[in-house]
């Protein structure tokens, strides 16, 4: 079974009407994932036994007709802990780690009878933009198997794009949901910082990380956010703001909506085909009644530098816990305690993770703190101020999600500076803690291109409203890669 042309609501109705059982649905989904795994390598762990056991239990008690997620199988990025299911963060360091508790988002999914179908491949510890730094090998883009799917949530994006999962969860620290969503032609959302609990998310940059949904349609995405959002006492950065119905504005027109298009987002370094797709999107939104004006986010160009100092500094602190003592890889043939630390971390971490730990440790050291980390934090404040000023006059901001379409596997993995610049359009959103969506907008040489829609803090509903209106006015989302239906 492929999920190319069916929504969660339609699939739910099939289960309610007993056109198929949850066990049949899950079994077919598992078969399809396993058939494509050798080509795509989008999963680290496939939860066959656990998923089928959960499916049989739901069939036995019956489907709740009022819960559209009951019995629906979804995929989970492998940095979100799942009790009894191996969680590796795509690292040798955690290659045999099985958590003894569930992340808050997993608890909320299971409270709605959602079935965890498996754990998806990713860049190691979410550090990367191509899913090439995984200890378990790179994931391949379903549109072209020689291209990257983006990252770090490349496995989640790939399984949804390939039609093998109707939905997935990812995490976004500097664009890790939105950029792969753009590269694979799906809908990916980074909610407002604090909208979703980070409890049980293996930390990279604690002031930047946010879990979010990845789906084929805007409405499915909003519906998934409905059941995972909300305050959690175990995450003090989670917001106590009331969780609205994120689907409430979907279907409403956008006439009169005022949208800004930053001139910096269509400047040098942006692929010409990407610019063309965005200009066509502007025309579509204008025809729908929105007013789109050129704006400026002058400090956004400093976002990448600020992000890699702040993110790497937070990562160097967060990853100190992986030392071979309590959990994770432990080196053999060691002479003393220091040897345990040094050898375990040297063997357990990949090159990109080591690079960021070293960068972060340097930025936080006594002699360089003021020149690097403190300065980056000041730049972050200026970027936030730029967004706040724009949102005094505009409802939304739009632009390309990524500067280019997906590129060839191996093309940039040894050139970190070039790879880091692929997130130049998404990083400022994380620094400011804003909600943002990537929605399919067009193609360049048969590879998907996404439109990024950025909203005010805790105004995901307006973002979904505009995204759904754009989706309904185009045919882009109805196209899909040529993957064989097993």
Curated annotation (Swiss-Prot):
Family annotation (SUPFAM superfamilies): Amidase signature (AS) enzymes
**Entry annotated with the keyword Lipid metabolism:** no
Q: Which residues form a coiled coil?
A: none
EC number in record: 6.3.5.7
User: GO molecular function terms here?
Assistant: ATP binding; glutaminyl-tRNA synthase (glutamine-hydrolyzing) activity
Q: Which GO terms describe its cellular component?
A: glutamyl-tRNA(Gln) amidotransferase complex
Give a single Pfam family match: Amidase
Name the catalytic site residues: 77 (charge relay system), 152 (charge relay system), 176 (acyl-ester intermediate)
Recorded catalytic activity of this chain's protein: L-glutamyl-tRNA(Gln) + L-glutamine + ATP + H2O = L-glutaminyl-tRNA(Gln) + L-glutamate + ADP + phosphate + H(+)
Q: What does the UniProt keyword field contain? A: ATP-binding, Ligase, Nucleotide-binding, Protein biosynthesis
* Any GO BP: translation
Signal peptide coordinates:
none
Quote the PANTHER family the UniProt record gives: GLUTAMYL-TRNA(GLN) AMIDOTRANSFERASE SUBUNIT A, TRANSAMIDASE
* Similarity remark: Belongs to the amidase family. GatA subfamily.
The UniProt function text for this chain reads: Allows the formation of correctly charged Gln-tRNA(Gln) through the transamidation of misacylated Glu-tRNA(Gln) in organisms which lack glutaminyl-tRNA synthetase. The reaction takes place in the presence of glutamine and ATP through an activated gamma-phospho-Glu-tRNA(Gln).
In terms of HAMAP family, this protein maps to: GatA (MF_00120)
Assembly notes: Heterotrimer of A, B and C subunits.
**This protein's name:** Glutamyl-tRNA(Gln) amidotransferase subunit A
Q: What is the lineage of its organism?
A: Bacteria, Bacillati, Bacillota, Bacilli, Lactobacillales
């Amino acid at each position: 079974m492929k999920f190319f042309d069916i929504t969660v609501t339609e699939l739910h109705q099939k289960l309610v009407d007993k056109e198929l059982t949850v066990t049949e649905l899950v079994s077919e989904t598992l078969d399809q994932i396993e058939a494509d795994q050798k080509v795509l390598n989008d999963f680290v762990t496939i939860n066959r036994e656990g998923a089928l056991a959960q499916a049989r239990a739901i069939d036995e008690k019956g489907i709740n007709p009022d819960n559209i997620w009951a019995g629906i199988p979804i995929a989970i990025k492998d940095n979100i802990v799942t009790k009894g299911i191996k969680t590796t963060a795509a690292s040798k360091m955690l290659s045999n780690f099985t958590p003894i508790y569930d992340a808050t988002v997993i608890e909320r999914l299971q409270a709605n009878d959602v079935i965890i179908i498996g754990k998806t491949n990713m860049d190691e510890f979410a550090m990367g933009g191509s899913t090439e730094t995984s200890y378990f090998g790179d994931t391949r883009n379903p549109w072209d198997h020689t291209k990257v799917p983006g990252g770090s949530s490349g496995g989640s994006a790939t399984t949804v794009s390939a039609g093998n999962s109707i939905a997935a969860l990812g995490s976004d620290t500097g664009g890790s949901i939105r950029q792969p969503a753009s590269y694979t032609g799906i809908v990916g959302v980074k909610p407002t910082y604090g909208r979703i609990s980070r409890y049980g998310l293996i930390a990279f940059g604690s002031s930047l990380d946010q879990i979010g949904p990845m789906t084929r349609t805007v409405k499915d995405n909003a519906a998934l956010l409905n059941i995972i959002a909300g305050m959690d006492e175990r995450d003090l950065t989670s917001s106590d703001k009331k969780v609205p119905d994120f689907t409430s504005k979907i279907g409403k027109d956008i006439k009169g909506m005022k949208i800004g298009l930053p001139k910096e987002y269509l400047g040098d370094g942006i692929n010409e085909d990407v610019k063309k797709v965005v200009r066509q999107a502007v025309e579509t939104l204008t025809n729908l009644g929105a007013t789109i004006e050129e704006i400026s986010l002058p400090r956004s160009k400093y976002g990448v530098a600020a992000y890699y100092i702040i993110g790497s500094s937070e990562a160097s602190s967060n990853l100190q816990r992986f030392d071979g003592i309590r959990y994770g890889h432990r080196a053999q043939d060691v002479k003393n305690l220091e040897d345990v630390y040094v050898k375990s971390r040297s063997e357990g971490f990949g090159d990109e993770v080591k690079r960021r730990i070293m960068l972060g440790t340097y930025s936080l050291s006594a002699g360089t703190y003021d020149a690097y980390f403190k300065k980056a934090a000041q730049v972050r404040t200026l970027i936030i101020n730029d967004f706040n000023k724009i949102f005094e006059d505009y409802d939304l901001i739009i632009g390309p999600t990524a500067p280019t379409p997906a590129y060839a596997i191996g093309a940039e993995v040894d050139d970190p500076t070039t790879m880091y610049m692929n997130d130049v359009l998404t990083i400022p959103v994380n620094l400011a803690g804003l909600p943002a969506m990537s929605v399919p907008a067009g193609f360049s040489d048969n590879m998907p291109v996404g439109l990024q829609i950025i909203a005010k803090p805790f105004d995901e509903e307006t973002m979904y409203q505009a995204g759904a209106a754009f989706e309904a006015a185009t045919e882009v989302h109805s196209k899909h890669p040529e993957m064989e239906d097993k």
